[in-house]
Regions:
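Short, low-complexity disordered leader/linker segments with a strong preference
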Residues: 1-31, 61, 104-111, 287
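Hinge/cleft segment of the Venus flytrap/periplasmic-binding protein
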Residues: 160-168, 179-180, 267-301
Length: 301
């Protein structure tokens, strides 16, 4: 009899644990995965922050993973999120080509994929959210033209590109050249990549200055590289306009301090929030657009 009571007691405890476990499962929030190319860049930190605020508001658990600019780590991150059972994947690709196979990992599990800021050149993408990078490049060029409208030239220009192969690199450069190449007084003396990295931007700019210090304009495909370029320019004592792209806080502070000249300001927090908003709509069976544009503006002193 005493043994039967013990068996009954253990059985009751197991039933309570199982009920508790099932209850916890019901209370769990649906998970959205977010894979960012790097969190060593204020732009993507702001994107993460915007997504987290929107996820909290809408009742989702946002799982954010950092690819550290490594396509192999990016794929591993997505594989982990697939195993976790996310209801949607927000991804900012390290590279538009390299990410294709990674997108297909999510596709095989029927997980909707939303790309942020940079496009994927393949795989099934449910929606893409970004600033109009071509338009942003054109805005940078129009700003330069306005600044030099009364000068005959030649005006020497340096372009510091982002990661080769990234859609943002391609589109920002295309937009810039759409305008600049129509005006003969501008002379591109150097076009080099610095991978959206501040330290590489500094090193690239130092090398360019050593080869030819006669520079009037620098257009960098993001603020991190522009800030690196500014450091090299200050050290060399030359006077040049430096235009970045993103509108991060460090760039705005540099502009306010009369170091950088301007930046094409994005709204990364909005891009992140829109990603979660679209994931929520997909989860609830609502239709969405395949492309969403976030507004840009020129920030200058």
């Amino acid at each position: 009899m005493h043994i039967n009571k013990k068996i009954f007691s253990v059985g009751l405890m197991l039933m309570m644990l199982m009920t508790s476990f099932i209850g916890c499962g019901r209370d769990n929030k649906p998970k959205i995965g977010m894979v960012l190319s790097t969190l060593n860049n204020p732009f993507f930190v702001n994107m993460k922050d915007g997504a987290e605020k929107e996820a909290e508001k809408l009742g989702y658990d946002l799982v954010v993973l950092d690819s550290q600019n490594d396509p192999a780590k990016e794929r591993a991150n997505v594989e982990d999120l697939v195993q976790l059972g996310v209801v949607a994947l927000l991804i900012n690709p390290t590279d538009s080509d390299a990410v294709v196979k990674t997108v297909e990992v999510a596709n095989k599990s029927n997980i909707p994929v939303i790309t942020l800021d940079r496009q994927a050149n393949g795989g099934k993408i449910t929606s893409h959210i970004a600033s109009d990078n071509i338009k942003g490049g054109e805005m940078a060029a129009e700003y330069v033209l306005d600044k030099f409208k009364d000068e005959k030239g030649p005006i020497n220009v340096v372009e510091i590109q982002g990661i080769p192969g990234a859609s943002a690199t391609r589109d920002r450069g295309e937009g810039f050249h759409n305008i600049m190449d129509k005006n003969d007084k501008f002379n591109f003396i150097s076009i080099q990549a610095a991978d959206f990295d501040r330290q590489k931007g500094l090193q690239v700019m130092e090398n360019i200055i050593q080869a030819n210090p006669n520079i009037q304009v620098v257009f960098a495909h993001n603020d991190e590289m522009a800030l690196g370029a500014v450091k090299a320019i200050k050290a060399s004592g030359i006077n040049a306009l430096v235009i970045g792209f993103d509108g991060n806080d460090d760039a705005k502070d540099s502009i306010d301090a009369n170091e950088m000249t301007a930046t094409i300001a994005q709204q990364p927090d909005l891009i992140g929030a829109l990603g979660v908003e679209l994931a929520n709509k997909i989860y609830n069976g609502e239709s969405i657009k395949d492309k969403i544009a976030a507004d840009l503006k020129v920030y200058t002193k």
